[in-house]
A protein has these predicted regions:
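Beta-rich carbohydrate-recognition and catalytic domains
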Residues: 2-128, 132-192
Length: 192
């Protein structure tokens, strides 16, 4: 299981800080889905020690500035994937802003698949997803953005209405033109 971890400083009733460099992607294992082990991976230093289960910390990774708390990892079932990319993860990059793709042979040690974000048009402030779509034979990504509404909407964010976008790719690097999801039925301009 992959999950996000935070090193938050709190006082009763409030969070004192939630800085980006205190966010982590973590890993745990289970044989039954009930009892979990957090293996000591020795990858990322936290509070002076690498004896932890952190697979990736937020901050610079080559030319990318990874936000390790906004990610989705999947086991790649594409029959053509190489052994060094059996696992893939889509992470948010802060500078440059966008979504980046990392690859791993074991789901623990990660390397960027490119030096720049593969998706740059969006908000990227929610759970961003990517996966191999075996029925269509391509990768698919979903992420959140803001769209300007066609009609005035009370209590709307000044950036527009929340929306979900998607794109596809044969290799998860160069994606098709971005499409906003549309919904059938009565129009109800409510934020997603």
């Amino acid at each position: 299981m992959y999950y996000k971890g935070f090193d938050l400083k709190v006082v009763p009733g409030k969070i004192v800080n939630e800085e980006i460099d205190h966010r982590f992607a973590c890993y745990a294992e289970s044989d039954d889905g009930i009892t979990w082990r957090k293996p000591e991976l020795g990858l990322v230093e936290f509070q002076g020690s690498k004896a932890n289960n952190i697979i990736l910390g937020s901050g610079p990774h080559g030319p990318l500035d990874v936000d390790a708390a906004r990610f989705a990892i999947f086991k790649d079932t594409n029959p053509a994937t190489t052994s060094d990319a059996r696992y893939k993860g889509i992470f948010r990059s802060n500078k440059p802003q966008g979504l980046i793709v990392l690859k791993s042979s074991d789901g623990i040690n990660w390397q960027p698949m490119s030096d720049a974000p593969v998706i740059t048009d969006g908000a990227f402030d929610s759970l961003n997803l990517a996966f191999w779509d075996e029925y269509r034979g391509e990768y698919r990504a979903y992420w959140r953005a803001f769209e300007k509404p066609s009609i005035p909407v009370p209590h709307s964010n000044s950036d527009g209405m929340r929306s979900i976008r998607t794109a596809t790719s044969p290799a998860l690097i160069h994606l098709s033109p971005v499409q906003a999801l549309s919904y059938t039925g009565p129009v109800n301009p409510v934020d997603l």
